[in-house]
Every structure is written in C-alpha cells, then in structure tokens.
Amino acid sequence: MSDKTQNTKPVAELNVEQVKEALIEEGKKKGILTYAKIAARLAPFTLDSDQMDEYLEHVGEAGIEVSDDADDEDPDETELVKEETESFDLTDMSVPPGVKINDPVRMYLKEIGRVDLLTADEEIALAKRIEAGDIEAKGRLAEANLRLVVSIAKRYVGRGMLFLDLIQEGNMGLMKAVEKFDFNKGFKFSTYATWWIRQAITRAIADQARTIRIPVHMVETINKLIRVQRSLLQDLGRDPSPEEIGEEMDLPTEKVREILKIAQEPVSLETPIGEEDDSHLGDFIEDQDATSPSDHAAYELLKEQLEDVLDTLTDREENVLRLRFGLDDGRTRTLEEVGRVFGVTRERIRQIEAKALRKLRHPSRSKQLKDFLE
C-alpha cells in the first residue's frame, strides 16, 4: 500500500468516485465550480455523457453553482484545466499532417467552414426554440458547431481510426449535445458540446480502434495504470515493476500483470523484419500444427515399408486391412461395412482380418516395421 493519503494523492491516482467527491467538497467550500474544471478533472475517466449530466445534476442538488466563466478558476488550477479549456481554432479547417483525405472530405471541410458561428445570444435564442420543439433550430445549432467537431477530432488522429470516422463519431456526440443542452444552467453550448463530442470519439476509439475490443471500463483501468506507470518512471528514473505499480494502485501484482497483458496491441504477422524488408514476422513463427521434416520423412518411410509388407498378403487380405484401418483415406470401416463391399458376412471379414494380422505378426514381416514402433 502507498503511504499517500487519499486527500494528497494526485488526481491521476484517484478513482472516479474519489474525484467526484473531491469536486463536491471543493464546490461546497467555494459555492461554485466551473464546467471546465469538472470536465478536466473527470477527463481521465471514461464517463459517458449521460453520466456527466447526472453528475452535474448532483452538483446542482448539492447547492453548488456550475459556472462557464473561466475567471472563476483559481490561479493554481490553470494547468489542470488548460487542455480541456484551451480555445479551439474554429477557423482552421485544414487537414492534420500525415492525414490523407479524398475530395468529398475536403469539400465537406470547405463547406462547414462557410457556416457562420453563433454568438452567445444566438445560442440562447436557438436553445429556447429547441425547447419549444423547433426542429429547424436543432439543425442550425448543430450546423454552426460542426467546426468544433473537426477541431476536436484532429486531436485524436493516429489513435487507430480514420480522420473521417473520428468526425462522424464526433458529429453523433454533437447531435446528442443538441438534444440535451439546457441553456438555463448558464454555460455556453460549445463548452457543453465539447464533452459530448470528446466522449463519443473516445468511446468509438475504445470500441473500434483495436483489433481485439477492450470493454470501456477496462480502457479506463488501462489509462489509469499508464498514468501511474509514467509517474513512477519519473520518480524512479526507470521502468516500474508490476509490484511497484500494484502498490501504488492498491492492486494485486497478478491483476497488474493481467491489465498489462490486455493493454498489449496485436502485432501483424506481415511486420517487416530486417533492413531489406524482404522477410516478415510470420516467417519466423513456428507452425505448431505442421509436421516436422523429420516426422514427415519417417512417415514416408513407414508407408513404403507398410506397402512392402502388405504386398506379401493375398489381395483380399490386403484390401480388408486397408478398409478396416483406413490406410488409403483415413476412414476406418466396421466389419459389416467391409462385408457389404465383399458380399460376405461380418464374421467372414473378422476371420480374414484375424488371419492377415497373424501373418503380419510373423517375425519375417514384423521386423521390417519394428524400428518404426520404437
């Protein structure tokens, strides 16, 4: 167990319930919390947007005002909320470096760049119309924030999903934000929508980006472990052991090893090996189901010797054994099945088989096969 107390632990080492409770306590002391601070503190956890809304209601029920004004932040909170509150450049509809897109996507980015942004008063006016059931107002509010989706999606490029897919998932989050936005809570739509968009994208990455899907709750655990791992790396100056990570996270060592194993990404068998790129990883992995060259050679020699031995029997004896033991096609037959082939009774086939096997057990024949049985 770590000797750190719950109240002095960094946010990265607290679980989601501890962070929620800490925010409530802080809000009760000050009487106010900013939406940006709440979003930033909860950002490391994979809360879905409904859970976020539920928590905001809980904050309100505790008598805490949720503000959208960054001036309400304490100076020492600047770094904590920087990533979540930094302004998005909504005029930049360029493509992130290294991202290849086709003409339709380029046209889409150009088209949404022509849509006028909304003022705070226009947002409120649209929100009131939406509250009254105006479908057209929903479309206008969503359309005016499509740039926001693109700006957020750019931050997740390189996480295993195509840029266009990131935009599509973000747009779905935007539509949910339009449906659930409550202007009476006092914060801007873009601040509220950012959470929904980011959660839609991160959840899609968790569901789709990996070859082997990892449940969202496990993604949260993996992210927490990685944060602790990085923190220990800075403190220790080396990679921490599973035991040290487990002590810091209050988890059994075996559980830490299990999480680390789950977090591993699959490696393609087509991964190039060497400088020439003419070999691949799959070329060096043993096929456990394949017959080894030595076993194959021994099998071929055994077949040859067996053929020689069977040639010493009568045609009927040889054919009965071939059918009974499936020497030709690998399928064994019953006495009755073989009897139907030869037009005799099953008892007669049993007698022929017994006589043939006695002949094979004779030293003059069996010695040829003896070496293969050792």
UniProtKB/Swiss-Prot annotation:
Q: Which domain of life is it from?
A: Bacteria
MF terms (GO), sorted A to Z: DNA binding; sigma factor activity
Which Gene3D superfamilies does this UniProt record tie to the protein? RNA Polymerase Primary Sigma Factor, Sigma-70 factor, region 1.1, Winged helix-like DNA-binding domain superfamily/Winged helix DNA-binding domain
Pfam families xref list: Sigma70_r1_1, Sigma70_r1_2, Sigma70_r2, Sigma70_r3, Sigma70_r4
Matching PROSITE patterns, A to Z?
SIGMA70_1, SIGMA70_2
Short motif Interaction with polymerase core subunit RpoC, span: 165-168
Annotated Gene Ontology cellular components are:
cytoplasm
Which positions does the record tag as DNA-binding? Answer: 335-354
The cross-references to CDD domains, in alphabetical order and at most eight, read: Sigma70_r4
Q: Which UniProt keywords apply?
A: Cytoplasm, DNA-binding, Sigma factor, Transcription, Transcription regulation
- Region entry Sigma-70 factor domain-3: which residue ranges? 220-296
Does this entry carry the keyword Transcription regulation? yes
Outline the segment boundaries, as ranges, of region: Sigma-70 factor domain-4. Answer: 309-362
Where the protein is mainly located, per its record?
A: cytoplasm
Q: Where in the cell is it found?
A: Cytoplasm
What are the GO BP annotations of this UniProt entry?
DNA-templated transcription initiation
- Renumbered to this chain, region (Sigma-70 factor domain-2) spans 141-211
Is the Cytoplasm keyword given for this protein?
A: yes
Function recorded in the entry: Sigma factors are initiation factors that promote the attachment of RNA polymerase to specific initiation sites and are then released. This sigma factor is the primary sigma factor during exponential growth.
Q: How does it assemble?
A: Interacts transiently with the RNA polymerase catalytic core.
Indicate the family of this protein: Belongs to the sigma-70 factor family. RpoD/SigA subfamily.
Put simply, this protein is called RNA polymerase sigma factor SigA
